[in-house]
Amino acid sequence: MDETQQFDWYLLRETDKARCFSESVHGSDSFWVPRSLITDYLKYPPKNPGELPLCMVEVPEWFAEKEGLI
């Protein structure tokens, strides 16, 4: 089994095949993660209306390294 990394990212948008996240609450520097690579996912409700929801996302370590996320 692959090693995984857990991140707290903000969800910008999602499709059937991928989710778009940002490390910033403002949505800057966004990136896509294929749903098939997300091993664990939990979306929290936004604290205030109009804010992006914060998510706990777990992905394979090799993917995080390849994308420069760690």
Describe the residue ranges of each PLM region:
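Feature detects long, helix-prone N-terminal segments enriched in hydrophobes
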Residues: 1-70
